[in-house]
Each structure stands twice: as structure tokens, then as C-alpha cells.
Amino acid sequence: MAVSSKHIPAPDLHRVRRALLSVSDKTGLIDFAKALHANGVEILSTGGTAKSIAAAGIPVKDVSEITGFPEIMDGRVKTLHPAVHGGLLAVRNDPEHVAAMEEHGIGGIDLAVINLYPFEEVRFKGGDYDTTVENIDIGGPAMIRASAKNHAYVATVVDPADYADVVAELEKHSGSLPLAFRKKLAAKAFSRTAAYDAAISNWFAEAIDEETPTYRAVAGKLHSVMRYGENPHQTAGFYLTGEKRPGVATATQLQGKQLSYNNINDTDAAFELVAEFDPARTAAVAIIKHANPCGVAEASTIKEAYLKALACDPVSAFGGIVALNRTLDEEAAEEIVKTFTEVIIAPDATEGAQAIVAAKKNLRLLVTGGLPDPRAKGIAAKTVAGGLLVQSRDNGVVDDLDLKVVTKRAPTEAELNDLKFAFRVGKHVKSNAIVYVKDGATVGIGAGQMSRVDSARIAARKAEDAAEAAGLAAPLTKGCVVASDAFFPFADGLLSAVEAGATAVIQPGGSMRDDEVIAAADEHGIAMVMTGMRHFRH
């Protein structure tokens, strides 16, 4: 049953006479406390926060003085007391509330400055179970929720970035804070506790291997507001979850304009793809446009890999994203800047490479310090009308699969290497995906078609266009291998690849007509390998 309201109107301006400060993150604390004291605000505080304020010579009263109860149980219980929560929740112009405050000696609290134990930081640093549990804040969220609920009389500050605004408003309004400002702070406060609880619930789900918990929360902290979203009429923001997976969200931007919504989406796709290639074994480069690869290649050097990737589709690569699995060096940088590129993302960049890229002031250069683990568990989420689709991350890696040769002819060692390469790439191409590969480089990519046959034909045509642009007598699909992200439902998709010149095929298998497809491969002397794993991508 819903709780009814007495409909007591909130004052526009409410005088701040008393503040409670209890923070884990002490950024800006002392200057803020000094400003509150200068504005005539009495300061209450807890534990380490009180000690820091007192050490700075600022008058402060420990919360135990108003509760009459010391901190106990290693600080687990210190603010869970009616003297604190009554002061936060009391409706100041309700006679019954005022009478209760007087009867029990409860003083009102007009400003609650609270931030929480660093649970998210401990979680993503891989703290042990007991340490992570100990960093679940109880009293902090309770005070935040209490004060934010009572925003008619209490201002709630959960972010040190808001200290300056609070001081400015106090000085502007002679020691009071306006209702609109208090509402804004309350909204942020509830967002903070929601995100905090989401992090805790998601961690617990992971800890007990619960893949589909009854309640699922996805939360993040605003990192930046985009100029616009996918299109200019859409608004957008970039939120960070706190996960330390190397990538665009955790990268350091060394130069260039602010990343756009599309830049971030494409850069993430590019870096996740290139991470499929072990940098200890090979240098690899992926060029991405609209979240699909234009070209991917491996070689002994980043420069060589880039040139091979670029050759796959140099027209589409214009204005694309370039991702590397090794450090960006001078030789590679000199080649990349010859083509208009939006973003370069790499584990690192030499000083010489940075100097070369600096000549293109709008080119964004990101370094990550490492590569994401393609085998790591994680979630992928997508919104639908009225719901949220959540699935585990596609962390299947072709090197871990039991590949089965299903044709009379087995692939050669060179073909098998290219087949694995092609399947790695196909995992990151929008379905239906067909990828032609030769000598460690894509030579044709067909993406996002409703018909697998059409994807095969588009990939072949792309290869023909690239060959013509390079002055080659024949497209590089002659003698190539082909990967399909899902099974061939009919032999026609395979025959399109054969017509393009493919000599070996890798696909998941699992079609009712696998026998027909295998027979067609045998008829044309094609080697076929089945993986047993599909890589649809929508």
C-alpha cells in the first residue's frame, strides 16, 4: 500500500545551518569545509573525515557527540541512529515532526555531504571476496537516500565536483540553497545510490555464477556529453561502468578532438577485433567503418599489416578507425596519416609516432596500455521497447575450438592458418558475414546482408574493385579461403565463394542441408572445416 503525503509545500530557499560530512573520497574536502564554516555552517562529521577537518583547524563536532553512541564494529555502525536520520528526514514545517525533534533532542541537518566506500574500485581491481564485501557501504547510502528524499529541507552532495556550485549558491543566497538546486542534487544522489547498488548486485551475480539474475541493473558514471548521438538530432552521453578492460573507455587520449558517439562505437569494435590476434605471435591491424571491418591483416610489422589491411578496401577506409595490437611506431604512423583517419587506438605509441600524428591535429590518438582478453567473460546489453536484452559476451576463440574437416580434401597448413584468421574476423562482422582471406589479410568482406549469397557476392565484388585499383590482373580471391559466421543453409552461398576463387571454407555447420553443402564442396575440390560455433552479430 502506498504511503500518503501531507502535501506540506517546500520552501524555495532553505537556510543551511548544519551540515553532516562523511566522505571516503576526500578530494576538495578541506577547502569545502572552510567555505561552509565561513558561511556560518556548523559541521558534524564522522571518523576519518572528522579527523581531517579538525587537523585543518576547522571547528567540527563528531557525530558520536549527537548520537551519544560511539562507532562500533570496526566502523560498521556509526550513523545508523535516530539522531542522524531524524535530523535528515524531519519535515521542518510539520508540527508533529517538530514536536518529535524537540522531545527527542534531535537537531535538523540541512546539508548532507556523503560519498561512499570505493566498492566499484575494489571490485574491478580484483579484490578478494571478504575485502570486496567489507567495501559495501551501508550507512552512506542510507544517509544519501534519507537526505535526498527530504530535499525539501536538505541538500545532498555526493560528488566533490559539486562543492564549488554549493558554495556559490550559498554565497548567492546569503547562506540558503534554492529548491531547484536541491532537487538537482537529489536527482544526482539517487542516481549515485542506484549505480552503487547496481555494481554490488552485478558483482554478487558474478560471484555466484548467476547468469540471469531476477533483477538486472546496468549503470555507469557520466564521462562526457557528446555533441550529438548517432545522428545530429539525437543527444548522447558516454558513461563508464568502472570495468578495467583495456579499450576506448579506459584509454588515454593523447591528442585530437573529442570522440564522437560514432567514434566510440567504432573504436570499441576495432580494438575488440584486433585483440583476437596475439601480439607475441604477430602484428595485426584492423580498419573499421560503421562498426564493420574494411580490412584486417597480420604481418611481421605494424606498417606491413596496415598496408595489407588498407589494400582490402582503400575507398571505405577513408575516414575510418585504425586499431593496432602492438605499439604504434614511426614507420606505421607515417603510412596511416597519408589517409584521412578519425581515430588510431593502440596499446602504446612511441614518441616519434606521436610527433608524426601531431601534424594531424584533429586525428585522435588513444593508448590503452594493453589489449582486452577475447576469452574474458562479460555481458552485452541492448535496449528494446520496454525491456533490456542481456547476454554473455561472445568470448569464443577459434584457437580453442575442435575443428573438424568434413570434406575429402583437408586444408593445407597455409589454408588452415588463413581459415582461422578469417573466422576471427568474421566474428566481428555484422551478419550475414562472409570474409575472404589470403596470406594473412582480408581481400573481400561482405557484411550485414539479409542473404548470405549476397554477402558472398559483395565480398567478391569488393575484391575485384580493390584489384582493379591496385592494377592487378585478377582479384586476390583467386586461391583464397572464406569464412562464414553461420552455416550455409543451401549450397548456393558456398558456390558463390567457389566462383570467386575460394579453395577452402570455414563455417560453424549445423544446417539441415550440411550434407548437400559438403557434397558441393567435394565436387569442386574444396576443403571445408566446421567449428561448431556460430558468431551472429547484429
Swiss-Prot record:
Q: Which GO terms describe its cellular component?
A: cytosol
Reaction(s) the record says it catalyses: (6R)-10-formyltetrahydrofolate + 5-amino-1-(5-phospho-beta-D-ribosyl)imidazole-4-carboxamide = 5-formamido-1-(5-phospho-D-ribosyl)imidazole-4-carboxamide + (6S)-5,6,7,8-tetrahydrofolate; IMP + H2O = 5-formamido-1-(5-phospho-D-ribosyl)imidazole-4-carboxamide
Q: Which InterPro entries match?
A: AICAR_Tfase_dup_dom_sf (IPR024051), Cytidine_deaminase-like (IPR016193), MGS-like_dom (IPR011607), MGS-like_dom_sf (IPR036914), PurH-like (IPR002695)
Report the EC code(s) recorded for this entry. 2.1.2.3, 3.5.4.10
Q: Name one GO molecular function term.
A: IMP cyclohydrolase activity
Name the Pfam families on file: AICARFT_IMPCHas, MGS
Give the pathway.
Answer: Purine metabolism; IMP biosynthesis via de novo pathway; 5-formamido-1-(5-phospho-D-ribosyl)imidazole-4-carboxamide from 5-amino-1-(5-phospho-D-ribosyl)imidazole-4-carboxamide (10-formyl THF route): step 1/1; Purine metabolism; IMP biosynthesis via de novo pathway; IMP from 5-formamido-1-(5-phospho-D-ribosyl)imidazole-4-carboxamide: step 1/1
Task: Name the keywords, alphabetized.
Answer: Hydrolase, Multifunctional enzyme, Purine biosynthesis, Transferase
Domain MGS-like positions: 6-158
* Record comment regarding domains: The IMP cyclohydrolase activity resides in the N-terminal region.
Q: What does the sequence similarity comment in the record state about its family?
A: Belongs to the PurH family.
Entries under NCBIfam families matching the protein:
PRK00881.1, purH
Q: What is this protein called?
A: Bifunctional purine biosynthesis protein PurH
